[in-house]
């Protein structure tokens, strides 16, 4: 099962993988989270229309659906194997941070009902905001809803960006000239995207596809301007090393997604100041301030200390520094595993190497690259 944020992801990142699955006789399903309907610049150019309304975007989304089905056909995957969830394009980060429980249950039901042996999902290191947000949702689904995974394996892929957090660990998929040619034909089906991005799209055909196998207790290395994260007894410490980004006019905002003490999803938002000062922490869902942290440093380097008690220690934390230049993010999300495990994960038993450790006795560090 391949889960993609947009029509065209299947061709850009997983064409060869899908061809291998077809040759192996595997059953295949492809799930598209959005229709890619909020894609204004190519639509304006192709339709010679500056102002786009809801009807225009709906029409564009249907066109992109048809392109995806044509690309799948080139790769040997029938149209009946594709499903479209029609989530709002360019809004997946907002959905993730403001309440996505219904979407998580939908995704969990889709995966559980079909029970694939291999699940391909976007990487949280992808620099497209929709891709990394969908990746976080699927990690939440993986950890919270799919307790009986059985023999299911999950793999992540990247479409956008060259994050070392992904590429330094990814496995390369072997590909033949025949498979590359089919990938080019699949990419060529996405005519709406080739008008403005032909070179960028065709460049994907010359790159080897890469995957990372996801682990149950995975730490994602530091990425972008975040050089390390550590849980301390009373605070979450985030070390920043920021470069100059002339295309980033706003103050960088830091987001932390986790669970509160009763297990509900909570997303904290804060502006990163340019000099040492207190930091007001807001709940992204209701825009209410609920905590105060401290920044020590300047516009280029420093440490954020955030009260660790605002999040449950038995769940993973996801952290993102938003410094968006034009459209793409500087980096995706980082994942810090749970500090406390109340019991073994499904299929695991406690060992001497995996004891239960109280929160005030553990320091969980994402090391500086």
Q: Where are these predicted regions, by residue range?
A:
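Active-site environment of divalent metal-dependent phosphoester hydrolases
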Residues: 10-12, 37-40, 125-131, 163-165, ...
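Acidic beta-strand-to-loop metal/phosphate-binding motif
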Residues: 117-127
């Amino acid at each position: 099962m391949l889960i993609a944020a947009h029509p065209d992801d299947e061709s850009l990142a997983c064409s060869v993988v899908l061809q291998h699955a077809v040759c192996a006789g595997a059953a295949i399903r492809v799930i598209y989270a959005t229709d890619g309907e909020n894609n204004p610049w190519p639509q304006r150019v192709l339709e010679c229309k500056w102002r786009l309304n809801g009807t225009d975007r709906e029409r564009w989304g249907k066109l992109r659906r048809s392109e995806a089905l044509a690309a799948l056909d080139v790769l040997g995957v029938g149209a009946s194997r594709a499903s479209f969830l029609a989530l709002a394009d360019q809004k997946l980060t907002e959905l993730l941070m403001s309440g996505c429980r219904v979407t998580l249950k939908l995704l969990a039901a889709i995966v559980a009902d079909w029970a694939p042996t291999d699940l391909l999902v976007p990487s949280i290191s992808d620099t497209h905001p929709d891709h990394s947000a969908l990746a976080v949702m699927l990690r939440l689904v993986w950890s919270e809803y799919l307790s009986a995974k059985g023999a299911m394996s999950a793999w992540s892929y990247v479409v956008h960006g060259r994050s070392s957090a992904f590429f330094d660990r990814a496995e390369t998929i072997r590909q033949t000239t025949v498979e590359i040619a089919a990938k080019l034909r699949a990419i060529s089906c996405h005519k709406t995207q080739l008008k403005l991005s032909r070179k960028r799209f065709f460049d994907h055909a010359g790159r080897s596809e890469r995957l990372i196998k996801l682990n149950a207790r995975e730490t994602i290395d530091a990425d972008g301007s975040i050089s390390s994260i550590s849980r301390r007894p009373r605070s979450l410490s985030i070390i920043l090393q920021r470069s100059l980004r002339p295309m980033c006019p706003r103050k960088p905002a830091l987001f932390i997604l986790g669970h509160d003490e009763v297990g509900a999803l909570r997303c904290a938002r804060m502006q990163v100041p340019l000099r040492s000062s207190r930091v007001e922490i807001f709940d992204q869902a209701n825009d209410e301030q609920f905590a105060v942290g401290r920044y020590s440093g300047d516009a280029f380097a420093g440490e954020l200390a955030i009260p660790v008690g605002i999040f449950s220690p038995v769940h993973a934390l996801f952290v993102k520094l938003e410094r968006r230049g034009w459209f793409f993010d500087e980096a995706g999300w980082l994942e810090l595993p749970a500090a406390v495990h109340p019991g073994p994960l499904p299929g695991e038993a406690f060992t001497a190497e995996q004891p239960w450790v109280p929160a005030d006795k553990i320091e969980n560090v994402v090391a500086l690259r």
